[in-house]
Amino acid sequence: MEKPRVRVRGIYATAVAKVLLDEGLELSDLSKKLKERIGHEGSPEPPHVTVKQSDDNPDQLVIIGFPEETDKVIQTLRKSMPYSVHHLARPNLHSAYVVEVDEECRTKLGEEEVRVKAKECYDGKKLIAEVVRSRVFPTDKLVMEEGFRVIGLYAELVIGRGSGVTFSKHITDLETKMLLMNLAAEVVRRGVKVHWRSSAKKAEPQVLLEELEKLYDEATKIMVKARDADHGTEVYPGERLDVVELTLEDKVILDEIRSKVVPTMPYHHSLKSGGDRMAAAVELGDKIAASSEVKAESVIDYIIDLARDMKYLNIIHKKVDGAEYSLGRARVRGNVDNYLVLERRSKDYGKYDGLDVVKEPGDLMITLVSPFSRYLIHAYYDQYGNEKGIYVNVNTGVEVGEGNVRYIDLEVDIIHKDGEWSVIDEDGLDRLPAPLRELAVAEVEKLLSHPDRIKEVVANARELLSAQL
């Protein structure tokens, strides 16, 4: 395998680019700003792998590309960012399989029942189907479509879905499009679709023609292989896709790496992913960091002030398997020390998990959030002010964004019930990657070394709420 070439994009690009360069990987298709920052032109050849901020979630990195090269990039980033959670798509995106379908176009891939998008199905029909949507998170559904594609550096050939030419959204010049359409004409006449990737606009025509022929030959071999293949046989590997849920701990590591390239304020990446107002504050903070120190305490003060202005915060509780839950919208009532005081009221009956105590309408639920700490304190009271229990959720560093509080749950928790402190759900530690497990154990030990501090903060929060009545 040649040295992987990687394209990096998004708010983490500078830090990620430095990590990859320092580990001996090559960069490709660099933005002008990134070239200036790192003093590196990058390879003129197109990338094998793209690492970018997710379009859907600024706390996530998306790593996608040719499987072998992508695995190398994932391995490299894991070393530098050990506390983040990787969600590898299964099976590979755009991988292709020989499958047998029934009359309703259903099939089984492994143990999972899948519906295949196809023009015509009958019981026992064998066909080649592409994975057009992989399973990344627990609620994701696998989607397949009849036909397949083969992917090159400059183009993709799509087989079994008609003919024609399509373009990357980054190819906009009409003259370039006309040239690429003419180059694809011969292959399209053979009944296939050509999709030109963004890298095609910079390549020499002869290079593009050679790749089209190479891809067509590969597609022909796949069809020959599929003739005698059994149901479930993979005939094309597709692209590796890894969605990385970045923890605060790794964002801080990326801050340190970025600071070796350009001035970087504390918690740069956490604030940058927190919302537009926070991102604007980062621009100013980085400029100040170029000439003087920006203290972490000042960042915490800024976040608390901003959260108070927000009035309400949604608590987003993420799990290591990728599941995500909203604990509800809480009213910001102020702060005691460095803790935001959030208030909710129960509207129905239920049970407080972990405490094994009945939840009733009118119960007061206080949540105490200390930005960047590794725990949340939840205190529960009945409508008469009697304590039902205290629940301390141990998690990755808490990030307070514009309208939300977010973290990854580390499974183990601490409770105070009937005058006693205890640790619960310790068996959940086995589900954590080793670095996160070590964080969780250390945090539990730290919290249990001064439980009176938890009670003190809760008491101060109650005083604040009482004073506002």
Swiss-Prot record:
It comes from the Archaea. Gene3D superfamilies: FomD-like. InterPro entries: DUF402, FomD-like_sf, Ntdp-like, RNA-bd_FAU-1. Keywords: Endonuclease, Hydrolase, Nuclease, RNA-binding, rRNA processing. GO terms for molecular function: mRNA 3'-UTR AU-rich region binding; RNA endonuclease activity, producing 5'-phosphomonoesters. It holds the Pfam family DUF402. Its EC number is 3.1.26.-. Coiled coil: none annotated. One of its GO terms (biological process) is rRNA processing. HAMAP family: RNA_binding_AU_1. Probable RNase involved in rRNA stability through maturation and/or degradation of precursor rRNAs. Binds to RNA in loop regions with AU-rich sequences. PANTHER family: PTHR39159, UPF0374 PROTEIN YGAC. Belongs to the FAU-1 family. This is Probable ribonuclease FAU-1. The gene is fau-1.
